[in-house]
């Protein structure tokens, strides 16, 4: 049989770019596998999700000292692997342009969590929105541990907008996401991070503890 290094060399020599071959061969092999896995997932999901690949931690964030301290504590808790102590979700609130996404990406780096942004899962075709959402949620569960990031939550998860004009799709989507966020089987596996600049427009029930534990 071949050693791990020999297997890594064979993989690196046949299925990688020069950038992927840098550093330790085992680490490089794992990077290649991770990259290929993401490519397959993105192809299967179309433009429904986007991966976050932060290259910096919270030390790159200027100011926000109190917020950074709290996020460092949460990151440390997540890294212990104790599911009982992990929060179900985080709510990031602030006006546009204050750096919410930058801070969240830095937090994910500190916590060692990959992140996926929920994107255009809504569709003009009847039934497609809900099937799109189910497909994304199944993939996210399969990729755990992971962070599910929902940007502009006031738009996608607003308090019932569209319920009377889209056949109830909006209400069913919000209900499904609330169920997912409060599913205790996800604790320590899927961390939901909801970002918004208008928390007053969010469905009230979404903001309760057990879905978004930290604000």
Q: Each PLM stretch: what is its role?
A:
Residues 58-215:
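Walker A/P-loop NTP-binding motif of AAA+ ATPase domains
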Residues 53-54:
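AAA+ P-loop ATPase central domain
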Residues 27-29, 57-60:
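A diffuse structural propensity rather than consistent per-protein peaks
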Residues 1-50:
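Interdomain "pre-motor" coupling segment immediately N-terminal to P-loop NTPase/helicase cores
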């Amino acid at each position: 049989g071949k050693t791990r290094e020999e297997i890594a060399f064979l993989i690196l020599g046949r299925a990688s770019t020069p950038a992927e071959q840098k550093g330790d061969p085992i680490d490089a092999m794992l990077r290649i596998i991770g990259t290929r896995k993401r490519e397959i997932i993105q192809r299967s999901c179309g433009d429904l999700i986007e991966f976050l690949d932060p290259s910096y931690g919270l030390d790159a964030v200027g100011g926000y000292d109190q917020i950074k301290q709290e996020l460092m504590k949460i990151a440390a808790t997540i890294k212990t692997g104790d599911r009982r102590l992990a929060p179900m979700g985080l709510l990031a609130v602030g006006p546009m342009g204050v750096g919410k996404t930058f801070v969240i990406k830095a937090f994910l780096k500190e916590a060692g969590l990959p992140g996926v942004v929920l994107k255009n899962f809504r569709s003009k075709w009847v039934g497609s929105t809900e099937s799109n959402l189910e497909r994304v949620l199944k993939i996210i569960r399969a990729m755990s541990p992971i962070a599910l990031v929902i940007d502009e939550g006031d738009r996608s998860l607003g308090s019932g907008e569209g319920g009377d004009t889209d056949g109830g799709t909006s209400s069913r989507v919000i209900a499904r996401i609330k169920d997912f966020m409060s599913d205790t089987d996800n604790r320590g596996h899927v961390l939901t991070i909801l970002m918004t600049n208008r928390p007053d427009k969010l469905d009230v029930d979404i903001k309760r503890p057990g879905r978004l534990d930290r604000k």
